[in-house]
Structures are given as structure tokens and as C-alpha cells.
Amino acid sequence: MSLAQQINRVVAPFEVISEYQPAGDQPAAIADLTERINNGEKDVVLLGATGTGKSATTAWLIEQVQRPTLVMVQNKTLAAQLANEFRELLPNNAVEYFVSYYDYYQPEAYVPQTDTFIEKDSSVNEEVERLRYSATNSLLTRRDVIVVATVSCIYGLGTPEEYVAGMVTLKQGDRVDRDQLLRQFVGIQYTRNDIDFHRGTFRVRGDTVEITPMYEEQALRIEFFGDEIEKIFTLHPLTGEIIREENEMYVFPASHYVAGPERMAKAITRIEDELAVRLKELEGQNKLLEAQRLRMRTTYDLEMMQQMGFCNGIENYSRHIDGRDSGSAPSCLIDYFPDDFLLVIDESHVTLPQIGAMYEGDMSRKRTLVDHGFRLPSAMDNRPLKWDEFLERVGQTVYLSATPGKYEMAKADGVVQQIIRPTGLIDPEVIIKPTKGQIDDLLGEIRTRVERDERVLVTTLTKRMAEDLTEYLLGHGVKVQYLHSDVDTLRRVELLRELRLGVFDVLVGINLLREGLDLPEVSLVSILDADKEGFLRSATSLIQTIGRAARNVSGEVHMYADKITDSMAKAIDETNRRRAIQVAYNTEHGVDPTPLRKRIADITDSLAREDADTKSLLESAGKGRSRGKAPVPVRHDGLAAVPAEDLVDLIEQLTAQMHSAAGELQFELAARLRDEVGDLKKELRQMQSAGHA
């Protein structure tokens, strides 16, 4: 039976809901892309200048072709940014976020020179883990799905067939033995916990079973009448408030690496066979220490798998569990998509090389582990896809970039251009200046911009030069900050926000001022040592850096150089080509460039507003009670039954959790907690107005 036959998929249309309509080059680009995809072209390039709305064009393309879509992005930060944009544009469709769930990850490794074995060590971000499970759940239960993912999506994941085989189907009126259902939940790696009810656990209260699936924020309640499922409800796991009644629900396994008893028994037999062969090899090479090490580690893992159906590092045995041949490709997120899915690769000039590099980096570490008896050779088949395996799995692909690479340009049959911005803004003018006296000239240009309440980006070649320049500018009264690789992600977001707000006027950086930096207030980008050929001054890097000034009406780029290199010439020629097209369009259509008004806001803003409101409400509720007792507000008749005193305690606790989540960059979780606090405060206000508080 196919996956589609086992699951009744939700089929809903992709629908963009926005106050804006396609403008500038967008209508033509959307029409051209749609025609090419519908005509079966396998590779399509969208050459979109910075600020032309490539993300919105992608959303409208998805609406036109009506296909599940995987959007691959170069890093987690841009993935989160893009996922939020798609959620705003397609609010009624499933927009999922799939990135590595490790906040910290140290893979197991062995250093032969010092005889040092490094154990695997990691810290998992639970909210990101939930979003990963949510992505696979959506892909298996509906078609209107967009998954925004980093290249981690090509790493091994359990097979969709086995994942669906472990699925438990719940339907009103079905006859099911309650104890048998509990055994099924345990079999797919859910844990019974009647005290601490959270994701991946279930609890039992008489004829009522409640479970929180790994991919859900809400819990499920199954009410039995004898051996019959009488009612199924979705409820709030914290308050017990019933959200809606369900007719049929699916509960997928609590791990992507789940295997039924029969498959696990076969896997154990295969592992034992491989172990016997490998031990013979090692002993034949007189590697007795390695043989003993491998015997102990593998035997322990086998005992855990026989007793528990699981072991730490079970992914290293995924080849045997999946029943794959040696050297064959693992399953990954792409295998969860239907055959007709669309692949979109954002900033393809950066993302594509990452895909190709993943396999070799992983393989060099694992070879050492296998050679020294820490892992069986089959562990090397728990890996990311090779480049050719990746190409075999993807169908039609759209490459998005302001500077497409040679690979995608060679693959595509023509290029779709998106040069005209909806705002009418044109690419910045590029001015070449001599390096002699460049710092004094830069200082004068900065002062001119500061008088106009505009911002400046300066990019240097070395860390030393960036530090010296920052110190020099500070000494001359310029409000300047230095953005470097040691600045953590949260502080980087704050720095960029402070630049836009005018807390300081100049930001100095090295290679941090390229893709994904959206700063409409910046009117000048100064590139020092522009004529020094290399990675940081390649044509691609220069075009991307020039694009940072493309969101301001009076944007300019100053290149300090004593000669014009080939890279400079290519970047300037491409910029001038785009400017000519943009100016001609504006003249023909009577368009006046309008400044881009982009809201300066983020999760920290909403948390600050929430804090002020919470403080006011709690003061009015007579806050000042003793601390130390945690409320247990799980009620079956909704929030109305929760005492006001407990509600106040709960609001305080969730507010603290909200700030903790934001501090750890768990913005999705922080936003969800903010919404929960809002609901609880609404209930408390109703109590106050009714005279109960």
C-alpha cells in the first residue's frame, strides 16, 4: 500500500494573501517562471537584483503551479527570515522550518596522533526539533506545504515508509483495546508520564488517554467507552481547555528512526553478521585493541536494541535498519516529498557549493572512527547525500540569486530576469576613488551622510584594518561599531537594528556585509582596497556588497582603488547594465523612486510591550503573594476554573520562560509563549471585570 493510500491527505490550494500586488518586473518574472515550470523545464534561473522581491515572486510562483515546495537556504538565520515571509504571504498553508536542531554539536571523533577519543556531545533545541517533526508530518498529511530548510535536509533521516508504518490511526467509533493502544504508543517511542506531560509523552486517567505528539503544540485526548473510541479532542496541554473535536487523527512516531519488531530483528542479525566479519579482519591485521573496542561497543548497542528497540547513536546502524545495501544513499527529507515537488535554491551561488561539500567533510571523520574500531564500516552509510545522489532525487529546480554561479547558468535554458524594483529604486551609482587619502575622504563622506540622517557601511579586507579604522573614526567623534566574526548571532541582530535606529551611524565589517542584509537607511557603502583580487573582492562578492546600498533612494558605492581589476569591471558593468534598465523603465512609466519603508521591529519589541502590559495588569491584580509554589492549572473545564491567584503565578512563570527563550534565540518559542501570556491576561482581565480577582 502506498503512503497516499494509507493517509487521507488534506488538499487545499496555495493562496497568497497580501495587500501588495506584483509590481515592477515581478508580473513578467512570475509569468515567465510559471510557463517554464509548466512546460517541464528542469532548471530555471531567476536573476533577481537585490530588493526586487524575489521571495514574494517565489510565493506567487508557488500559487500559480500549486506544488509542494522545498526552499533551500544557506543558513539558519536566513531560513527563519524566509519562513516568516512565506507565513505572512501564505497564512492558510503549511509553511515549515527544517534546520539542524542542535544548538551545540560535537560529533564523535578520534585523533590517532594523541590517542584521543571525543564522545558525541550535543545540546538539542526542543522547539526546532518540534518544527522538524512538524515538517515531516505536514508532508505526509497534506499537499499545500512549503518547507524552508538549510542544507542539513540532505542528511540521513529515517525512511518515510517505516515512519508511516509506525503511525497509529485513531478514529471515532473504532473498537480498540486501550492497553493495546498504550503498547502501540510505547512501540513508537512515546513514554508514559502521568506527572510531567510534555511532547513525546502520554498519560492515562481511567478511560481517558492523552498524548502530545512530537510535532504538535497541542495534545490529543482519546476517551473510551469500553473498547470503543467514543470521542477525540485536541486540547491545550497546559490548561486542559478543549480546542476542537476530531473525527480522525494520526499519531506519528516520536522518532524518525523507528523500526517495527520484525525489521529490528532483521537489522540485529545483519549487524551481528557484519561485526563477525569486521572482527576477523581486524584480528587478521593484528589490531587486537581495535577488535576488542569494537566488540564491546557494538555488543552493548545490540543489547540495548534488543531490550529497548533503541540505542544511543542508532543512526549509525541506519543502513541495516533500512535494509539498504552497502554504499547506498540514505533516506532524507527530500524522500518525504511527493514526486512532483518543486525545489527552490535561494542564494544559489552560496548554497549549491555547500551541498557538494557536505559528503567529504562527513566521510573523513568517519573513516578514522571505523579504522580504529569505534564504529562498524556500515556507519559510513549514515551520511549526507553525495552530489549525484542529490541530483537524482530532485526534479524541477528554480535557482534564485543576484549573482548566479557558473553551474546553474550552464544548466538553465535561458534566464528569467527581475531587475525592476516595485519601489522604483535603482541600483546605486559606483564611484571609484584613489586609495591615497582614502580614510580622510571616507570621514568626509560619513559626515555628509550623518547630516542627512543616513547610515554608512564600510567593508575592509582584514580584522586588524577594521579595528584600526573603528578606533580612528571613534577618535574623530563618529558613532561607529565594528561587526566581526566573534559577535554572537543575537548581538549581531541587535547591532543591525541599532544601526537602523540611529544609535550609531557607521558599521565596519569584513565579510559580513553581503547576502541577507536588509538596511534601507544605508545610503553609502564604502569598499576599501577594492582592487585587491581575492575571495572578498571577487565579482560576485562586489555585486552582493553593492546591493547593500540598493534600498536607498540616494544610494552610492565608493570603491577605493588605484586600478580597475577584472572583478571590479564585471561588477561595475553589471551594476550599470541594471541601472540603465531601471532608469529606462522609470522614465517610460513615470515612476518616481520611493524610499523603502521597512518596519524596524523584532521579537524583542513585542516582548518589551508585553512586559509593560503584564506589569500593569499584575499590579492591578494585587501582586505580592508568596513565591515558591508552582501552580498546576490543568483543568478539564477550561481556564474559567483556574483561580485568579494561580493565573497570576502562571503569567509570571510564562513571562520568565518567554525571555529565556528569546535569550537563547528560540524566537518561535518566545513568540508562542508571548501569545499564551496574552490569552491568560485576557482571561484575568475578564475575571477582574466580573469581580472575581
Swiss-Prot record:
Residues 648-683 form the UVR domain. Its main location: cytoplasm. InterPro entries: Helicase/UvrB_N, Helicase_ATP-bd, Helicase_C-like, P-loop_NTPase, UVR_dom, UVR_dom_sf, UvrB, UvrB_inter. Residues 438-600 form the Helicase C-terminal domain. It is found in: Cytoplasm. GO terms for biological process: nucleotide-excision repair; SOS response. Residues 612-634 are annotated as: Disordered. GO terms for cellular component: cytoplasm; excinuclease repair complex. A motif (Beta-hairpin) lies at residues 101-124. Signal peptide: none annotated. Transmembrane segments: none annotated. SUPFAM superfamilies: C-terminal UvrC-binding domain of UvrB, P-loop containing nucleoside triphosphate hydrolases. The keyword Cytoplasm applies. ATP binds at residues 48-55. The keyword Hydrolase applies. CDD domains: DEXHc_UvrB (cd17916), SF2_C_UvrB (cd18790). Keywords: ATP-binding, Cytoplasm, DNA damage, DNA excision, DNA repair, Excision nuclease, Helicase, Hydrolase, Nucleotide-binding, SOS response. One of its GO terms (molecular function) is DNA binding. Residues 35-188 form the Helicase ATP-binding domain. Forms a heterotetramer with UvrA during the search for lesions. Interacts with UvrC in an incision complex. The UvrABC repair system catalyzes the recognition and processing of DNA lesions. A damage recognition complex composed of 2 UvrA and 2 UvrB subunits scans DNA for abnormalities. Upon binding of the UvrA(2)B(2) complex to a putative damaged site, the DNA wraps around one UvrB monomer. DNA wrap is dependent on ATP binding by UvrB and probably causes local melting of the DNA helix, facilitating insertion of UvrB beta-hairpin between the DNA strands. Then UvrB probes one DNA strand for the presence of a lesion. The beta-hairpin motif is involved in DNA binding. Belongs to the UvrB family. This is UvrABC system protein B. It comes from Renibacterium salmoninarum (strain ATCC 33209 / DSM 20767 / JCM 11484 / NBRC 15589 / NCIMB 2235). The gene is uvrB.
